[in-house]
A protein has these predicted regions:
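Beta-strand-rich recognition/accessory modules
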Residues: 1-8
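Glycine- and acidic
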Residues: 16-25, 34, 66-70, 130-134, ...
Length: 204
């Protein structure tokens, strides 16, 4: 698998020893708290510090925030531009958690584009971890998410991405396709995920 499926330059590289803050803080953290955690790990051989869920939008619980990929300035004054150098000064790279395939119903993104979430017309949308799934079969959805994530990644020296997905696909129906083509959505969705991954991989 490593020789034939994993692409260069990752194929031969040694994986860094990393830690993240999730179990230590869940959604309740500040920049100073994260730096304190990183300092505590400094002498343990940790090479990469990953900031987990809760750094963006109104993400104080798992009921909100997904889809609004802008840094929460109350938690992280000065944004990633201010936080990342503080972590790097401890001799660690900086990694970032994202869950770009998902959206919260209370998010600005969902309020503006409710049709961008998968869901069968006339039926309540299925929720997992209080979130819906964005329709990555649609180009405009992918372009929006790609642009939002790239803006975040361009703001600081991000060495690693933790791409999460905390629920399964269900009620897979795209508002962009007629009923007789809904069987294509699963396949088109996966191709859409590959599209964003490929673009980000080429960028960075």
């Amino acid at each position: 698998l490593r020789e034939h499926l994993i692409r260069d330059p990752c194929r031969e590289g040694r994986r860094p020893v990393l830690m993240n803050n999730w179990e230590a803080t869940y959604f309740d953290f500040t920049a100073d708290k994260l730096v304190d955690i990183a300092k505590g790990a400094q002498g343990l051989g940790i090479e990469l510090f990953v900031m987990d869920d809760g750094w963006f939008g109104s993400r104080d619980t798992d009921l909100s925030g997904l889809g609004d990929w802008s840094v929460n300035q109350e938690k992280l004054p000065g944004g990633l531009e201010a936080l990342v150098p503080r972590i790097q000064a401890l001799g660690m790279g900086f990694g970032l958690w994202i869950e770009p395939e998902m959206v919260s119903e209370s998010s600005r993104l969902y309020r503006e584009h409710p049709d961008w979430a998968l869901g069968v017309p006339g039926r309540p949308q299925a929720r997992g971890r209080s979130q819906l799934v964005l329709d990555f079969s649609r180009q405009e959805v992918r372009d929006y998410i790609y642009t939002a994530i790239r803006k975040v990644l361009d703001s600081a020296d991000i060495a690693y991405i933790k791409w999460d997905m905390n629920r399964s696909l269900s009620d897979v129906w795209s508002a962009a396709l007629p009923a007789n083509r809904q069987g294509e959505v699963y396949h088109r969705y996966v191709l859409g995920v590959y599209d964003i991954l490929e673009r980000l991989r080429q960028d960075y």
